[in-house]
Amino acid sequence: MPITDTIIYNRSGLFSQRAQTSLGWIRAISDGQHLTYLDWNQTGWTNHDQPDDVSRETITQLTAYFHGDLRRFDLPLLPAGMSQSRRRWLDVMTTIPFGTTISYAAFAAAAGHPRAARAAGTACATNPIPIIYPCHRVLRGDGQLGNYSGGSHLLPTHQDNLQ
């Protein structure tokens, strides 16, 4: 779904929209043109929402995803604090099909770095836009959860919501 590009910046240049989901409260943060961060950490959420089209659309799509009505996100993404090479790892994550999981080793191989399972794990652990970049679909070689950036404490009780 297209996002309008008529944006009025707030003082910080960032916009946010939060919503209650099946995983708890989530906040989408945008630079006015791209989704840059997805946050569960309510500590420090003292500011009020200042939504824009991107943050609103992110919450709309996440809501549809959690209700089972959406399997692939269509959002403009620019992960906060990520170099181009780090973003390539995230782009590979988006190719993992809905409802499937792969190992860190398989993820590394898919990214063209078959001997870099630890780097694959780091890419998952430092993902600033979890769910949209589906790091929850990447597991340890033994099939167990690794260091998921959204917080591995979320996954055992909410695995069915994260496909």
What are these regions (language model features)?
Residues M1-P114, Q163:
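Basic nucleic-acid-binding alpha-helical/helix-turn surface characteristic of O6-alkylguanine DNA
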Residues I59, C124, S152:
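Short amphipathic alpha-helical/adjacent loop interface patches that line ligand
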Residues R115-P130:
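Regulatory, non-catalytic segments
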Residues I131-V138:
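Short Lys/Arg-enriched helix C-cap and helix-to-coil transition segments
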Residues R140-G143, S149:
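Short helix-start
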Residues Y148-Q163:
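Positively charged, aromatic-accented nucleic-acid-binding surfaces
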